[in-house]
C-alpha cells in the first residue's frame, strides 16, 4: 500500500515584546490622569474601572506603535492583512483604553479587533514568582497561570 501524503505547514507570524522607556511610560500615565469616558461597556472583562485613553499629540502612536508596526513589517511582512481593495490603507491608532485592575478582577479569553494590538503593564502590585510558588504549593499544579498574561495565538 502506498500513501499519498501531502504536507502542509501554515505560515506563522511572531509578536514583539518592547520595554517602554520612561518618556513613553510617563506619557501613558499623563493620559491616564485625563481619562475621559468609561470604557467598561465595550469590554468583556470583569474589571470595574476601565476608561478610554486619549493619546495626547499622538505621542504613543508616533514614538511607540508606528515604529513597532514598521519593525514588524520589516521582520515578518504585512501579507497577513491583505485586503481585497485597490487602494492602500494607512494604519492608525484607534480604541485605546486603560484598565485599573484590582485583586479578583480578570479578563477572560477575548479578542481585539483591528490588525495589530498591544498591551502595556505600568504597575503590577505583586511578584509573579511569588504568586506561582504560592499556588503551586497549595494544589501541586504543573502550570503557573496566577498573575500571568496568556496569549492565544492563531492565524
Predicted regions and their residues:
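Non-heme Fe(II)/2-oxoglutarate
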Residues: 1-107
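Catalytic core of non-heme Fe(II) oxygenases with the double-stranded beta-helix
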Residues: 94-155
Amino acid at each position: 500500500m502506498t500513501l499519498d501524503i501531502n504536507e502542509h505547514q501554515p505560515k506563522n507570524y511572531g509578536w514583539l515584546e518592547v520595554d517602554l522607556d520612561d518618556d513613553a511610560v510617563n506619557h501613558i500615565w499623563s493620559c491616564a490622569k485625563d481619562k475621559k469616558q468609561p470604557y467598561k461597556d465595550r469590554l468583556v472583562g470583569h474589571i470595574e474601572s476601565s476608561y478610554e485613553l486619549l493619546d495626547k499629540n499622538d505621542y504613543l502612536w508616533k514614538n511607540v506603535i508606528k515604529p513597532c508596526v514598521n519593525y514588524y513589517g520589516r521582520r515578518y511582512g504585512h501579507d497577513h492583512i491583505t485586503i481585497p481593495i485597490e487602494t492602500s490603507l494607512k494604519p492608525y491608532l484607534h480604541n485605546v483604553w486603560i484598565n485599573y485592575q484590582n485583586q479578583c478582577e480578570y479578563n477572560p479569553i477575548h479578542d481585539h479587533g483591528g490588525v495589530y494590538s498591544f498591551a502595556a503593564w505600568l504597575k503590577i502590585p505583586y511578584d509573579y514568582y511569588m504568586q506561582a510558588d504560592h499556588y503551586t504549593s497549595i494544589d501541586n499544579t504543573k502550570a503557573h497561570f496566577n498573575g500571568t498574561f496568556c496569549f492565544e495565538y492563531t492565524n
